[in-house]
Structure formats: structure tokens, C-alpha cells
Amino acid sequence: MLLFPGTFTMQTDYAELVRRTIRSVPDWPTPGVTFRDITPVLQDPRTFRVLIDLFVYRYMRQRLDLVAGVDARGFIVGAVLAHELNLGFVPVRKKGKLPYRTVAEEYSLEYGNAAVEMHTDSVRTGQRVLLVDDLIATGGTMLAAIKLLQRLGANVVEAAAIIDLPYLGGSAQITATGTPLYTVCQYQEGD
């Protein structure tokens, strides 16, 4: 059940509630980095409900076929959202975690490479998929997941995240691919 009728002001107020509930942890995992921790949002049933409802309201009329969630925190929101929208959920996992035939997409990290993978039968050609993660920083994981879904024939309708750190450039890279992007909260450098 949606908690709000969907007016812009109410959506903005609810997004601000989510933002205020996210914990900022300075100097973690390394000095100079401020980690944005969504666990307080997940621990508070009202705020978690509001977060999910923000996504449900946005996507309930999009004629989606599936929700894909990026390992690992994208699973939490993505699976709940898929349930609320009465859709299937597809995990986009870190390489080596899925038991069946997989297809992988590599992406660059600051000090090396990583990969995400999906089962080869997880999406069908032409299916309309929403891709969800918790946070967009440099965008590498989300971009790899988009490429992977497209390689399997999916139409990535939109990428969505709870948090965007636009100063790290990931959201700009995602939108540059032509994939629309929705984020609930944005943090600027120094916030």
C-alpha cells in the first residue's frame, strides 16, 4: 500500500526522510572516504516502506517484466521492489557466485578488474528490465550490469539507485549510454 498520493512535494519530503536516515561514516573504508550506510533505512520499517514506495510509485505503470538487482545491497531493495510490483527478480552477481551457465561482464576498479555475471537464461530477448543498486559512485558496476543485460537481449528501461555521488562521475557515464537514471538521494562532495 502506497503511503503517499504522489505529489511532487510529498515525494521530495519522503526522499529527504530517506536521506536523513542514511548514516554517513567518515574515513571508512579508507581515510578521506565517507561511506553512505543504508542499514539505518533498512532497520526502520517506516523509512524502508517509504523508500520502497518511492520506487513503486515511479515504476508501477512502466510495464516492466523484471527487476534486476546488483550484488549485494541492490538485492535487498530490488527483491522487495520486484515483490511489490508482482515481478520476477534477477540477481546480477559477483563472478563465481552463480551455479548454472553464466555470462559475465568485466569492469575496471581503481586497482584492477572485477566482473559481474548472470545466468544465461535469466532474461529473454525484449524483456523490459529495471536495474537497481544501492549506490552509484564511479558507475563501473552499474555500467557492467547494463551491458550484461543488453547482451542477453533485455531492454533496460531505467537504472535506479538509492544514492548518487555525482561528483565521482558514475551517473553521467550511465546517462551517456542512453539509459535513463533515477536516484532518490544525491550527495555532493563534502556533504
Curated annotation (Swiss-Prot):
PROSITE patterns: PUR_PYR_PR_TRANSFER. PANTHER family: ADENINE PHOSPHORIBOSYLTRANSFERASE. Signal peptide: none annotated. Keywords: Cytoplasm, Glycosyltransferase, Purine salvage, Transferase. GO terms for biological process: adenine salvage; AMP salvage; purine ribonucleoside salvage. GO terms for molecular function: adenine binding; adenine phosphoribosyltransferase activity; AMP binding. It comes from Bordetella parapertussis (strain 12822 / ATCC BAA-587 / NCTC 13253). GO terms for cellular component: cytoplasm. It is an enzyme of class 2 (transferase). Belongs to the purine/pyrimidine phosphoribosyltransferase family. Pfam families: Pribosyltran. It is found in: Cytoplasm. It catalyses: AMP + diphosphate = 5-phospho-alpha-D-ribose 1-diphosphate + adenine. Gene3D superfamilies: 3.40.50.2020. Catalyzes a salvage reaction resulting in the formation of AMP, that is energically less costly than de novo synthesis. Homodimer. Its EC number is 2.4.2.7. This is Adenine phosphoribosyltransferase. Pathway: Purine metabolism; AMP biosynthesis via salvage pathway; AMP from adenine: step 1/1. Its main location: cytoplasm. InterPro entries: Ade_phspho_trans (IPR005764), PRibTrfase_dom (IPR000836), PRTase-like (IPR029057), UPRTase/APRTase (IPR050054).
